[in-house]
């Protein structure tokens, strides 16, 4: 059951480095993260990615300065971004009452079989098996969606023994040989199929206190996206509680309102930090993106 929840929650910490990515790369964090997943870590491809994604909307001088800074401090920057995401994701998983197995699986998601990953440079069997499986699954999904099954299989073989545990690759080969495996991934009922896989023996009573903790945790995920909104959801919940009390609402009603307040900005995760943290006036398209956060 730990693998199931590791896979679903592996990106819990992603919002925590979004603002930093925008600051360093002068770019849209959403497209940056999406495209970076296709980079295999080789220096030529990393450099090509940096040049192709840094400061495209900035002035020439500003762009050159950003690229030079990234090239000079690339290793430190990569370590900072991944360390932040992995640590935050693992912490939130624990806050959601998942055990150390799930938390460790999330924390070590970017470790590579050959020891070249991050954040701890773990190697081989020292990497939690949940992380080894999740990393391969993530790469397969990215390349299958963008370029098809053949491209996904090629990437797995290319990274076997470097990024990926050969034993996990061997298991994937057996799955990939079955046409039904790929057909299910593109089937309209995929979400329902994933929910049906939930391990029945892992049952946690969903009481009122647990619901509160879930709302608090996801409020923190949202607030971590931008330094300008740190603690915002918690403060809105506090204001909501005070107003509801003044209106004479009962405790149960106030509790639900607090949860709604903590989660009111969930859709902000779908808005780029290039928009959220922009120091100047937003243009028409940027305002439209901000307004869509309620829909998200």
What are these regions (language model features)?
Residues 1-296:
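Histidine- and acidic-residue-rich, metal-dependent catalytic cores
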């Amino acid at each position: 059951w730990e693998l199931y929840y590791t896979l679903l929650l592996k990106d819990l910490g992603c919002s925590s480095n979004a603002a930093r990515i925008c600051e360093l790369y002068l770019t849209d964090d959403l497209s940056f993260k999406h495209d970076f997943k296709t980079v295999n870590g080789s220096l030529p491809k990393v450099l090509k990615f940096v040049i192709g994604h840094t400061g495209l909307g900035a002035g020439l001088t500003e762009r050159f300065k950003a690229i030079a800074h990234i090239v000079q401090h690339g290793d430190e920057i990569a370590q900072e971004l991944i360390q932040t995401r992995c640590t935050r994701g693992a912490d939130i998983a624990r806050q959601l009452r998942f055990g150390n197995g799930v938390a460790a699986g999330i924390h070590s998601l970017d470790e590579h079989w050959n020891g070249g990953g991050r954040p701890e440079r773990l190697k081989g069997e020292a990497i939690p098996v949940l992380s080894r499986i999740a990393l391969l699954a993530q790469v397969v999904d990215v390349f299958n969606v963008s370029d098809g099954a053949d491209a996904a299989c090629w990437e797995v073989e290319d990274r076997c023994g470097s990024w990926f545990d050969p034993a996990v690759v061997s298991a994937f080969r057996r799955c990939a040989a079955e046409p039904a495996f790929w057909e299910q991934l593109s089937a309209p009922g995929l979400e329902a199929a994933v929910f049906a896989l939930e391990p029945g023996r892992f049952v946690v009573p969903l009481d009122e206190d647990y619901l509160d903790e879930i709302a608090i945790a996801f409020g923190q995920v949202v607030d971590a996206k931008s330094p300008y909104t740190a603690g915002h959801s918690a403060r809105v919940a506090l204001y909501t509680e005070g107003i509801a009390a003044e209106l004479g609402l009962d405790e149960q009603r106030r509790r639900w309102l607090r949860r709604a307040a903590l989660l009111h900005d969930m859709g902000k995760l779908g808005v780029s930090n290039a928009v959220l943290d922009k120091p100047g006036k937003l243009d028409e398209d940027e305002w439209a993106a901000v307004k869509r956060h309620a829909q998200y």
